[in-house]
Amino acid sequence: LLEAYRGSISQLEWMSPATRQEALAKLEQFTVKIGYPAKWRDYSSLQLSATDLVGNVRAAEAFEIAYEAGKLGKPVDRDEWHMTPQTVNAYYNPVMNEIVFPAAILQAPFFDLEADDAVNYAGIGAVIGHEIGHGFDDQGSTFDGPGAVRDWWTEADRKAFEERTGALIAQYDAYVPADVAAHYEQLGQAAPHVKGALTIGENIGDLGGLGIALKAYKLALARKGIESFDQAPVIDGLSALERFFYSWARIWQQKSRLERAELLLATDPHSPNEFRCNGIVRNLDEFYETFNVVPGDELYLDPDQRVTIW
């Protein structure tokens, strides 16, 4: 994934040599943490009760506040994790310029030792690409390689970046989750839309993550002497790219109550899963070629409307 980002950044036509050099330097300084921390937190002083829920919440909050206050005046612990190993998630920490992948996300549907590369690159590969992408999104791009807030962009490059992110914001502003749309149609009211500006950081991560994962998969095939996706083996009647895109769709399967969907729509910096999947693939040319998507199809976007950032 890092190699794919390196190659992509090196070839970006909208980025000047000065900014490209800074971006590549930041990429080389990423720290990667996988699985679990080198040392474990000690929770022995946290006293909990099986019969006092509110008391437990208060005790946990007090414990955490004391833990954070105890860091004052001490050197920064660069080995610290801010997510437990049993959490199915991952994160990017801009002040450390680190990407962290807990053990729990290294399982199906994201990663499966029995699955082929197409499936895994669209799963954990896209997650890795997403977290790297946060280093170059609307917020992460304001930090440099060592993790300091610094403007390392030329004015023209920042403008070009914002033009692309603006187009992505406009795409997502138009989306309404299917269940929410159906509910408001019954009410005869206008349905709330995805907030493109609120979700732009995560949408940049998703778009870059899947696009770079696809490039990384192509690099992996090339190492095996396979020069194109068409030459990759067909498995269970599915081509390599079909398996890739189906794997991407699978990781975003979700069921939720309408009330939950509306709450997330109003407050969550992540787009609804429906659009984390469909809103991304419609920007990738390979999706159109794989499934013969043509004008008139629901996910079709004119080529000049498709957004590529990284």
Regions found by a protein language model. Give the residues of each.
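Intrinsically disordered, low-complexity linker/terminal regions across diverse proteins
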Residues: 1-131, 135-310
